[in-house]
Amino acid sequence: MEDVCTECGFDQSSTPAADVGPALERTATEVADAVRSVPLELLRRRPEPRTWAPIEYLGHLRESMAFHRWLIEQAVAQDHPEVPMVDPDESVAAADYRGADVEDLLGQFHRRVMRLGAHLAALPPGAAACSLTLGDRPITVALIARSAWHECHHHLGDIRRPGGL
Ligand SMILES: [Zn+2]
């Protein structure tokens, strides 16, 4: 849950939540283009045993977009709720994305990005300051929104890497 990342060069710590939706949608389009550009023989292959295949990064992002929207809903609907941390490695392994249809996943990812963007655009005044505790860390709606964008930006690099794009 970050809005500054030295690894991928992302720094949107001053971007207001209201501006995140359109930017997220643009980055998500780049993700979809990158996935479609990965050579078929590399799409489902892990470069190393502990590094996800490109299609697994897409599956993770599909989950991540729904999770971020759900977190924002919880933070706005309740008074600083506590939400347990999730393990992305576990859920990606359980979903078996390497056996999934890539166009199905791209469609689901796109719909979840659009839903998250619409949700951000419709946030009531002051909602960006609503907060929750994820694991042991207090976070605001504004950070959750920027973090969703960072997820796409960060994994765009992971998806491009194995194909050398
Ligand atoms: Zn990053």
Question: Where are the regions that the model predicts?
Answer:
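Short, contiguous alpha-helical
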Residues: 1-2, 44-88, 129-165
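Terminal targeting/low-complexity segments that flank the catalytic cores of oxidoreductases
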Residues: 1-26
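Non-transmembrane alpha-helical segments in soluble domains
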Residues: 21, 32, 55-58, 62, ...
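Acidic/histidine-rich alpha-helical segments that form the ligand environment
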Residues: 23-27, 32, 90-129, 148
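A glycine-rich, hydrophobic loop/mini-helix early in the fold
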Residues: 26-52
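Surface-exposed helix-capping loop/turn segments at secondary-structure junctions
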Residues: 37-42, 121-129, 164-165
